[in-house]
Amino acid sequence: MEKILIFGHQNPDTDTICSAIAYADLKNKLGFNAEPVRLGQVNGETQYALDYFKQESPRLVETAANEVNGVILVDHNERQQSIKDIEEVQVLEVIDHHRIANFETAEPLYYRAEPVGCTATILNKMYKENNVKIEKEIAGLMLSAIISDSLLFKSPTCTDQDVAAAKELAEIAGVDAEEYGLNMLKAGADLSKKTVEELISLDAKEFTLGSKKVEIAQVNTVDIEDVKKRQAELEAVISKVVAEKNLDLFLLVITDILENDSLALAIGNEAAKVEKAFNVTLENNTALLKGVVSRKKQVVPVLTDAMAE
C-alpha cells in the first residue's frame, strides 16, 4: 500500500506533533501505511510529553513530493503554514480545528473541522467511531495536546468536549491531568536557554488578514518580565524578519500561563491596528492584553476585523 505522510503546521506545537502521531497510529490500525512527520523543531513542552510517554519524535522533513503522492494535514489547513511543496502533493484529508483560509484542492477530500479547542479532541472521537482502542502512550500524547491547546482548560477555546476527552484520555494514560499538565506547561515555559530567534519562531504562524501579511508568534511563560527584559534584542530580530518576509505586522504574544494575561509586542507598518483591535495604547511597542491567552480565538479574529477597516 502506498505510504501517506501525516503532519501538522510549521513551527510545531504539542497538538501538531501529538495529533500527527495519534492519527498515524489510527490510520495504521485501520490498514493504511501512514507515517507521522514534523516540519520543524520540537519545543520543550512537546519534548516533555514525548519523554514522559516514551515516544519518539516524528522524523523531520522539508518536502513531501519526493517521498509520497498523498498527505494528510492535521491541526492546520492554510497553505503558508504547511509543507513547502504542498502544491505538488494530493491532500487526502484534513483534520483541524482552525478557521479555513487560503485552502483549495484539485480533488475531493475528507475534510473534518470542528469548533473545539484541539485536534486531539476530534481524533478521540474518530478512534471511537472506528472502534479502535487507544493505547496508553497515545492517550497520554492526546491528553498533552488538549492540555497544551487549552492552557490546562483555562483558554476560551476550551469546550466541554475537550474537557470530557481529556478526562477519558487521562484515565487511559494513568495520569492526573492537572498535576501532569502543570508540569508539562512549566517545561514549555522555561525560556531561559532560548535565543531571541528561537523565542519568536517557537510557535509562529503566518496569516493573510484582509490584504495584509501578518505573523503572530506566541510564547508561554511563568513570568512576562523574563521575556520583556530582552525587548531590545527581540525588536531587532523581529524587525529583520519583517523586512525579510515583507510583513505588514509581526505580533509577539507573551502569555503568562499562571495569570492568564498576555503582553503584546507589535512591530511593523500596521502596528496601530493592534491598538484598534484590543482597544489598548502601545507604549514602547508593547501593551498588556488582560485575559488574552488564545491566538486562535482572541487575537486572529479581532486583528482580522481591524485590518479590514
Curated annotation (Swiss-Prot):
| Organism superkingdom | Bacteria
What does this protein's record comment on cofactor binding? Binds 2 manganese ions per subunit.
Known EC number: 3.6.1.1
Q: Which cofactor does it need?
A: Mn(2+)
List positions binding Mn(2+) 1: 9, 13, 75
Entry's Gene Ontology molecular function annotations: inorganic diphosphate phosphatase activity; manganese ion binding
List locations, semicolon-separated.
Cytoplasm
Keywords assigned: Cytoplasm, Hydrolase, Manganese, Metal-binding
* Name of one Pfam family that matches: DHHA2
Q: What top-tier enzyme class does this entry carry?
A: hydrolase
Q: Which residues bind Mn(2+) 2?
A: 15, 75, 97, 149
| UniProt-listed InterPro entries | DDH_dom (IPR001667), DHH_sf (IPR038763), DHHA2 (IPR004097), DHHA2_dom_sf (IPR038222), Mn-dep_inorganic_PyrPase (IPR022934)
Name the chemical reaction catalysed here.
diphosphate + H2O = 2 phosphate + H(+)
Provide one Gene Ontology cellular component.
cytoplasm
Does the keyword section mention Metal-binding? yes
Do you know which SMART domains this protein is assigned to?
A: DHHA2
What family classification does the UniProt entry report for this protein? Answer: Belongs to the PPase class C family.
How does it associate, per the subunit comment? Homodimer.
The protein in question is named Manganese-dependent inorganic pyrophosphatase
Gene name for this UniProt entry: ppaC
